[in-house]
Amino acid sequence: ELEALKNDIVTFAKIRASYAEVGQAGDYMDNFFSIPVYGGGFYQLTPLMYPINGNTAYTPHYVIYDPNLKPQNTKSYEFGADISLWDNIINLSYTYSRQNVKDQIFEVPLSGSTGAQSMLTNGGKLHTNTHEFTVDFNPIRTKNVDWNFGFNFTKMLNMVDELAPGVESITLGGYVTPQVRASAGEEFPVIYGSTYKRDENGNIMVDENGLPLKGEDGVIGKVSPDFMLGFNTSLRVWKFKLSAVFDWKQGGQMYSRTTGLGDYYGTSIRTADREGTIIFDGVKADGSKNDIEITGPIAQQTYYTR
């Protein structure tokens, strides 16, 4: 304690810092060369149904392991400050942290000529920056009544700095477009899929039927929110206590296949007026504004598949 800093306003103040370094070996769920085949058909891509006469079959596992695989390494830095004012009526806290992940373990896709689908290897370098700010306010604090408010703000940015040599993105989930991927130079994770073809001004281009043209596959959205807010309050009167919590996430996208199929089959609310006309907001090949009407349920079904 420093006597020179004692006063009636600042009750407590602290500056903190920490450093940690952790290694992680990764998950080895399939550490065998071959796996038994049960059933058949579409899932096994074979017309045969196993077991046959009580005999099962084995197929090579689609994942191979890098013989030079090493643990991924995470270095964490954290800096922060805490301050309490007016006998802890107001408490403020701020924390900045950064995580650097090196040798991130991923399943990196391989060419079919290798006889495997992917290889578990050290395939990336990532970093995370986090800012967190909290405020606690306790305006009423008596023996029989206590009322407290809390507020917090969090902003987190995950970035993929690099992946394995020759690999631009790694699929984390999804069978067809769109997929969730880790892409070099992008936030982690991102939604990767078909994009619209655009002109030099960023306008979506349409074909001679008024339907949007498909562009190259790429990043079409990010999963993580821009920031998160939280609010909580609790009121205690004698032995009774009432609490409330409010959470808010701003930003971030998601893809709903259910909604897409509802649009395609005409069962969603926004396709209720499918007997009318649609003019897609875009430009034609000559650069003029699109004025081609899409009419009828069949044409609109084609529109929703784009």
Stretch-by-stretch model annotation:
Residues 54-62, 100-125, 157-224, 232, ...:
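Surface-exposed, extracytoplasmic segments of Gram-negative outer-membrane nutrient-acquisition systems
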Residues 1-183, 235-238:
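Extracellular/periplasmic, surface-exposed regions of secreted and cell-surface proteins
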